[in-house]
């Protein structure tokens, strides 16, 4: 990465900077903190797909760069891609944020990591900028909350959210004698469908559920939390107790979720273990297994179609006819009957950015109604701007948008407090242990409890 040094902080109030920047783009040369660095060059870091043929983010940012440079003569935008699987991306990003020599002006932050980076002092609070930005009122409150620190300040502008459910191959299901309008009521229904695929459709992976430490947060959120949050009635968080502000040790629901994962791999209903523990398994699910009819069921996210749209490199215009969608059921079919997890990403400004004010102007360009809608559709994302969500042009833009948007009613958000990344890693280790058979469910749960105490500094409770 090219180094970015910060320039000395000025004594002018941030709110004054916002007013100046909004009023006159040409004054942006004077806007920005830090020491050194080129005040006319904005460095924007982003997560680049590990699949060379998928250029969704690259194409979108290139268009925003063009718009921004045209509106701000003399300013240049340098796009700084980080090409890595999720777990490696987070590590590389944090390394960049530690020094003014390497910190970009704008970074793409997963909401699960943002509180950890806030606590580490890596990010700049955006409240002075947001106070002068009328469009901020258009964002839904839950999306805003995902980018808030424990200090009550906001550190990121969300660019969409997501939900999760079950994708299934209608062709594989037909061969397995399963219905095209499949909607499982319980976890056992999901496993039974996978068993039918295994028995009747040889050569096809019956079910993919992400697992293990190499896969990173996808294992925790797409699989484990989709299971864990379906073990109760949805009224309380099974991972974190908000009243006591303590993390919850492995209880029955936790063990049941591990048992589901163990069952998938013990009965060989999932991919080969070596494939399941490949950091790039998600790329294979989207780019190979589903399009080629080699996978029966995928527990995955709303964003998958971004890899199949025109210009994506893996064009698959028939996907909406060849794939079915079903909500993930609760464990025993108990109310509310369905479960989803939501996360999303935000644009954040590093504390050591050279040009923070210029960076926020770039965020405002990205988040106009038109540009935000363009991104939601291209990225197969769920809108976080109320005006876009209410626009028929958005809901009709792509098959599946309405289905996944409706799951917001049943969705949950991770307790993304500073300890969460370490808690998530402990979950992944427990999953990996039962996937490989290195530990029983009971052993993995005990090891998790020990790791949880370390991750949470002893702030744990049992329920």
Regions found by a protein language model. Give the residues of each.
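Conserved N-terminal structural module of periplasmic/extracytoplasmic solute-binding proteins
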Residues: 2-9, 17-119, 133, 358, ...
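Hinge/lid segment of periplasmic solute-binding proteins
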Residues: 111-163, 220, 324-327
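Glycine-centered hinge/linker elements that transmit conformational signals in sensory
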Residues: 193-194, 242-278, 328
